[in-house]
């Protein structure tokens, strides 16, 4: 998350319940537009490091220029083409290597898990369910895979191909990083890596599955499902705006 591949890195913390009757604040959704990965990475770490018990939870929606990200225990050998021209950024999430680029929705979840009384595994399940429900809204069947967080095509010619990646970091009981969903993108950069550390893993987007979906429409559907799965509440107002999508 980056949006990011397949595992969760967690700093040990006791996940305790919020005080009895304490309301959970609504999630604020921030539509950050096209943004360099490093800018998002620095901003989410700063947000997490400076938040207090009263800081509201946020969901950031962004589209990145081409970039590979490698998890903190990732093996650089999974980058198969060293001179691809796509920059590589080492990050503090779990998992191996993944790719972000235009036409992909990246969502960062900046949540206080203790206040929400959420265990990490439950959060992962809620995120995966939101992606599955979003794809179902476009008549695409998708599934989880045991031991490999992310979402995969359920049937057809591309059965087993990965369409969404997931990777989180938990610090002081709060999450950052998040998920990516491939809508309509140039998939060739995935051929220069072992996606999420799996040699030969096929990666697809919604366009590969004959769905001509608009990036903004899918993003709004996905955010709606995430918020509904987290707490059923409405997001705090931060007016969404259309992003300019590149077909590069």
UniProtKB/Swiss-Prot annotation:
Quote the gene name from the UniProt entry: lipB
> HAMAP family in the record, alphabetically?
LipB
UniProt EC number: 2.3.1.181
Picking any one GO molecular function of the record gives: lipoyl(octanoyl) transferase activity
What pathway does this protein act in?
Answer: Protein modification; protein lipoylation via endogenous pathway; protein N(6)-(lipoyl)lysine from octanoyl-[acyl-carrier-protein]: step 1/2
* EC top class, as a word: transferase
User: Per the record, what are the reactions this protein catalyses?
Assistant: octanoyl-[ACP] + L-lysyl-[protein] = N(6)-octanoyl-L-lysyl-[protein] + holo-[ACP] + H(+)
What else is on record for this protein?
In the reaction, the free carboxyl group of octanoic acid is attached via an amide linkage to the epsilon-amino group of a specific lysine residue of lipoyl domains of lipoate-dependent enzymes.
UniProt keyword Acyltransferase present: yes
Q: What does this protein do?
A: Catalyzes the transfer of endogenously produced octanoic acid from octanoyl-acyl-carrier-protein onto the lipoyl domains of lipoate-dependent enzymes. Lipoyl-ACP can also act as a substrate although octanoyl-ACP is likely to be the physiological substrate.
Q: Which GO terms describe its cellular component?
A: cytoplasm
Q: Reply yes or no: does the keyword Cytoplasm apply.
A: yes
InterPro entries on file:
aa-tRNA-synth_II/BPL/LPL, BPL_LPL_catalytic, Octanoyltransferase, Octanoyltransferase_CS
The active site lies at 196
A biological process from GO = protein modification process
One Pfam entry for this protein is: LplA-B_cat
**Predominant place of localization:** cytoplasm
Which positions does UniProt annotate for substrate binding? 93-100, 165-167, 178-180
Family as reported in the entry's similarity comment: Belongs to the LipB family.
| Residues annotated as domain BPL/LPL catalytic | 53-238
Keywords for this entry?
Answer: Acyltransferase, Cytoplasm, Transferase
Where is the site labelled Lowers pKa of active site Cys? 162
Kindly provide the name given to this protein in its UniProt entry: Octanoyltransferase
Q: Which domain of life is it from?
A: Bacteria
Report the subcellular localization: Cytoplasm
